[in-house]
Amino acid sequence: KAECIHEFQPDVVVDAILAKRNLGTKITDAPFVVGVGPGFTAGEDCHCVVETKRGHYLGRCIWKGSAIPNTGIPGMVGGVSKERVIHSPGTGMIRGIAHIADIVEKGQILAYVGDVPVEASITGVLRGIIKDGYYVPFGMKIADIDPRKEEKKNCFTISDKARCIAGSVVEILLSNGILPK
């Protein structure tokens, strides 16, 4: 909820929660507000939006309008799209069994949501998983598997997409005279 924003009174707010929608960020939260991804409209709830959809427009700085809407379809990785993303099978506290960078097999238990097991949907490298102890609602994205086992090193580096988006945020701030103090 970022309720502390008003306590800190920052010069800039960058909403990079990546929830694929605006969870309450307002253009009045700071003198300069950047929204990252779909759900933000430049000039309404932020000053600028950064495009996060892979492709020709990734990292584009949008000064009027919105990012491309969320399609709900994950990007293709190693020939796999929807199958690599795991959603919560129930509502409750998550308890992880597998860890980021583990090689997992299809059907292997990765975690539990409450008492409900969460199984690997494909064989590959576990690229991401929600941290233990978090409450997750039914259907929330909780894990991501990369089918390319040989790309385990990617678990410990910053992706091309993340670098592009971060670079765009820096470009936006510097082009508006916003410098670190």
What name fits each language-model region?
Residues 1-181:
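Well-ordered secondary-structure scaffolds
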